[in-house]
Amino acid sequence: MSDDDSSHDLPAANLQQLRLPDSASLRPAFSTHRPRILILYGSLRTVSYSRLLAEEARRLLEFFGAEVKVFDPSGLPLPDAAPVSHPKVQELRELSIWSEGQVWVSPERHGAMTGIMKAQIDWIPLSTGSIRPTQGKTLAVMQVSGGSQSFNAVNQMRILGRWMRMITIPNQSSVAKAFQEFDANGRMKPSSYYDRVVDVMEELVKFTLLTRDCSAYLTDRYSERKESAAELEHRVTLKSV
């Protein structure tokens, strides 16, 4: 749009940086590789129900055609307690960049997600140079509880997903009394809780396939285009001086 287009009553906007939605950009050629999904879980316990739930999610995602990697948080330092060059930090960041979608699984402890879960997310930056490790990627959230069903952890993770500029899918899973939902071999028993996990993983793969090839377009923002144009104009002005 040009600035002299009087048919638009938007005096506060830079019309040169406004873009009408382009349906063709929302339907690019589809990638043929398997969806890449990263799973994070928030416990270091030997018998960890969030880890067991993460493994069930992995099996389902692989059935639905995804390539899945599960990050082991053992050895990950607390945020700011080690340099970003720490091997576990680098592993986590590289996996986040690799992924096209993520699953976050946390126990609920004292009405919140665990510190182990939060530490993993805190180590992932919003941007590293021109790379944004999570922006535009899909996210599914799940939690386990030792008592009655609760949604505090998944609600918190949804807020974090928004701050990380992710596309959090509508469905979610909260497994109550998790110690009753797994057998002696660590496999989840048939139940409505398991059915919900299936629903969530199926939905995540669908949303990932739907958005991964146009995520850059979906997150292309007017304010950032305006800022980039101003920076470019400033550089050109400096060169001409």
UniProtKB/Swiss-Prot annotation:
EC top class, as a word: oxidoreductase
Source domain of life: Bacteria
Family: Belongs to the ArsH family.
Recorded name of the encoding gene: arsH
Self-association and partners: Homotetramer.
Transport listed as a keyword: no
Keywords in alphabetical order: Flavoprotein, FMN, NADP, Nucleotide-binding, Oxidoreductase
Listed InterPro entries: Arsenate-R_ArsH (IPR014063), Flavoprotein-like_sf (IPR029039), FMN_Rdtase-like_dom (IPR005025)
Binding site for FMN: S43, L44, R45, T46, V47, S48, Y49, S50
Cofactor: FMN
Coiled coil: none
The enzyme's E.C. designation: 1.-.-.-
Entry function: Has NADPH-dependent FMN reductase activity. No activity with NADH. May play a role in resistance to heavy metal toxicity.
Protein species of origin: Rhizobium meliloti (strain 1021) (Ensifer meliloti)
Mutant phenotype after disruption: Sensitive to low levels of AsO4(3-) and to a lesser degree to As(5+).
Keyword flag Nucleotide-binding: yes
pH dependence statement: Optimum pH is between 6.5-7.5.
Record-given protein name: NADPH-dependent FMN reductase ArsH
Single biological process term from Gene Ontology: response to metal ion
GO function term, MF aspect, one: oxidoreductase activity, acting on NAD(P)H, quinone or similar compound as acceptor
